[in-house]
């Protein structure tokens, strides 16, 4: 067996500023920024245990260690790693009040999601070319980097039909660098960084008071969200299972999943190529209707109906066909 421990400390501070300048009576510019400094320190330890007592041993029997490695891909290790990041994120928003019933805006902003360390207990240490295990040096995949994004958006908000109807629209485009993608690996989720990806789309929504008692609503979205070059994505559970069978036959790939090895020839993981894969539903929307009426005794009764529709999409970042929502 094995006993695993995980501990992480995070220290962070940030400075934020935002201000608005009126260029004209109907034109204003809002600008701001956020500066963040973050430090993380992780302590990850896995001990192999005596099969009879369950007690951890710093010097496991080499045969027991070999069985653990062959069966579960797990080696005794102790990692003490730290990382720090600092990010400056500006934001700008230009708003134009064209009339009492129409407003337009254009905005640009940057953001980030901090990197960190994977907490699953089967993280493996590094190996030298001669097969020596460096138990205090983490192998590939233990740490993942910050995800950063820059976003552009333009849109409008309108009041129509003497206030009985509102209509809003927005077009957006976001570019991600080192996008963080979570993949289930059997004992937990592992986060890895994808190559650059782009997310763009158009959203429209409408609400209308059709009568004194009836209110209608609708919204529709078109989304184009694809991975860039992402040839190091985690394999699906089915692919990983097929790969184990392939390795037993001396092959290094199966079902689009390729084995990865250390310099010593030890398997250190697996990956697949999902470059250009779609990340979300291309089309989605809702339709709604609400009808209400006042009864003679002052009570209100109402009837509501909602319809939601969406295109096919993957529920997981590894684009597992079994996780397609239709």
Located regions from the model:
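Membrane-embedded beta-barrel scaffold of Gram-negative outer-membrane proteins
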Residues: 97, 103-113, 119-121, 127-202, ...
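Face-selective signature of the C-terminal outer-membrane beta-barrel domain
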Residues: 1-54, 79-80, 84, 95, ...
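Gram-negative outer-membrane beta-barrel transporters
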Residues: 25-26, 164-166, 170-175, 192-317
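Short sequence motifs at beta-strands and strand-loop junctions characteristic
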Residues: 3-12, 23, 39-41, 80-88, ...
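Hydrophobic, lipid-facing positions within transmembrane beta-strands of outer-membrane proteins
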Residues: 11-19, 88-94, 140, 150-154, ...
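A general lysine-centric signal
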Residues: 37-40, 91, 113, 157
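Solvent-exposed loop segments that connect transmembrane elements
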Residues: 1-5, 41-82, 118-142, 181-192, ...
């Amino acid at each position: 067996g094995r006993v695993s421990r995980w501990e992480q400390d995070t220290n962070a501070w940030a400075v934020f500023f935002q201000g608005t300048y009126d260029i004209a009576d109907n034109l204003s510019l809002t600008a701001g920024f956020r500066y963040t400094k973050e430090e993380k320190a992780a302590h990850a330890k896995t001990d192999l245990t005596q099969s009879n007592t369950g007690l951890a041993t710093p010097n496991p029997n080499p045969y027991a260690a070999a069985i653990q490695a062959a069966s579960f891909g797990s080696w005794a290790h102790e990692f003490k790693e730290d990382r720090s990041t600092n990010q400056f994120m500006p934001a700008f928003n230009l708003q134009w009040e064209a009339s009492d019933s129409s407003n337009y805006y254009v905005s640009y902003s940057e953001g980030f999601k901090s990197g960190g360390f994977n907490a699953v207990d089967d993280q493996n240490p590094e190996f030298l070319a001669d097969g020596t295990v460096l138990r205090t040096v983490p192998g590939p995949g233990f740490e993942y980097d910050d995800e950063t994004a820059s976003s552009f958006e333009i849109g409008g908000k309108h009041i129509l039909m003497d206030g009985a109807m509102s209509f809003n629209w927005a077009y957006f485009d976001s570019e991600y660098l080192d996008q963080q993608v979570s993949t289930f690996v059997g004992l937990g989720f592992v986060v890895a960084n994808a190559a650059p990806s782009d997310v763009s789309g158009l959203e429209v929504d409408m609400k209308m008071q059709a009568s004194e008692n009836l209110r209608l609503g609708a919204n529709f979205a078109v989304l184009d969200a694809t991975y860039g070059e992402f040839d190091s994505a985690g394999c699906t559970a089915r692919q990983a299972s097929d790969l184990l069978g392939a390795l037993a036959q001396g092959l290094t790939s199966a079902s689009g999943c390729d084995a990865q090895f250390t310099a010593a020839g030890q398997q250190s993981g697996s990956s697949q190529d999902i470059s250009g894969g779609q990340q979300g539903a291309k089309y989605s929307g809702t339709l709604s209707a609400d009808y209400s009426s006042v009864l003679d005794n002052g009570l209100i009764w109402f009837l509501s109906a909602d319809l939601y529709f969406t295109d096919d999409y993957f529920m997981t970042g590894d684009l597992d066909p079994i996780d397609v929502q239709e």
